[in-house]
Amino acid sequence: MDRIHITGGTPLNGTIPISGAKNAALPLMIASLLTGETLELINVPRLADIAALTRILGNHGVDHMVVGKRPGQTAETGQTVRLTASNVIDTTAPYELVSTMRASFWVIAPLLARFGEAKVSLPGGCAIGTRPVDLLIMALEKLGAEIEIDGGYVVAKTKNGLRGAEITFPTVTVGGTHVALMAAALAYGTTVIDNAAREPEVVDLAECLSKMGARIEGAGTSRIVVEGVARLGGARHEVLPDRIETGTYAMAVAMTGGDVSLVNTRTELLASALDVLASTGTEITALPDGIRVRRNGGGISPADVTTDPFPGFPTDLQAQFMALMTLAKGQSRIRETIFENRFMHVQELARLGARIRLDGDLAVVEGVERLKGAPVMATDLRASVSLVIGALAAEGETQINRVYHLDRGFEALEAKLGRCGARIERVRA
């Protein structure tokens, strides 16, 4: 099993190109099942989760072709892919494939909408709480699907196609909104999605579906209206920049010091997180094609955050921000409201010398003067990168084990950090 070795204490300086967002690319790839024509996606990151979904789509008969890369990206990043679902041979998504990645469950929506049936295994992915699929199933049932759970599979059928309906989510759900959008695009009549997720990745999916011929209004608000159409066609669409990767590298610079330009990204994708970061004493400057992050001396000021759906502070940056706060000059309080059991990184940060106390959904971080390198173990995707950030600022060497979690969500991480001066090396098993 691969490990990453980091020798900390070096400020980051240089330029980091931000990859396409994994959390946008996954539903976009799944949307290829809605049409028999070709969907071309630009700026798709090279990640383990993307490869896993490619295998799942291939199992259904989707043809996948890599045709190039996004201009401005490095050799190891930013691929352009063409997906063609003209010969779907199977509407079953088996356990051995779906269990590797939670988002793959979303294939149930386009399969059901286009073919009238789907059999999809209950999902896997990061082990952060239960994250049930109940809301996704509820949305499909509202649209007229007949659903049963049989042997660990969700079996969905519709006799005469899906029909528009009013869907009100009791809590904000990104996955549920993705599923509702894809299913409603081919449903008969009008679908209204209330309490819809407002995340940029939802907007990106809606924009791509619109290019394919869908009729969608209100994406980016809490109320989305979809007028179903009889068929969707092919399209060409660029995946939006990864706001979580942007925030992660910004926090790495804030923690280690230095001056880094994050390019191929947009400030509006991360407004709340950048505001919080600025309050810690980090200088944030907008660039024409990204942001510049600087911290050249002075301590890190403590700050309190509560994770919330967009436009609030992202849960996917909670672990990274906690790593930053371990060196703050004072106490900070971090409340996690999106997922339960998302503090698994705490005990590993403690191995580096962090002082963190947990009380339910609240983490109280007492800043320390310094961290010291130690062997640590990644527990999930975002927790693993928080250990990278901590290790970059720690004295001495840190060995991070189980880094396959990193490969699920961070494209060319060692190369990007290494070009900015980080002393980071992957040791192959």
From Swiss-Prot:
EC numbers, comma separated: 2.5.1.7
Active site (record annotation): 126 (proton donor)
Entry annotated with the keyword Cell division: yes
Subcellular location: Cytoplasm
Catalysis performed (reactions): phosphoenolpyruvate + UDP-N-acetyl-alpha-D-glucosamine = UDP-N-acetyl-3-O-(1-carboxyvinyl)-alpha-D-glucosamine + phosphate
Residues engaged in binding phosphoenolpyruvate: 22-23
Domain of life: Bacteria
Protein's UniProt keywords contain Ligase: no
Function noted in UniProt: Cell wall formation. Adds enolpyruvyl to UDP-N-acetylglucosamine.
This protein's name: UDP-N-acetylglucosamine 1-carboxyvinyltransferase
The organism's taxonomic lineage, starting at the top: Bacteria, Pseudomonadati, Pseudomonadota, Alphaproteobacteria, Hyphomicrobiales
Gene: murA
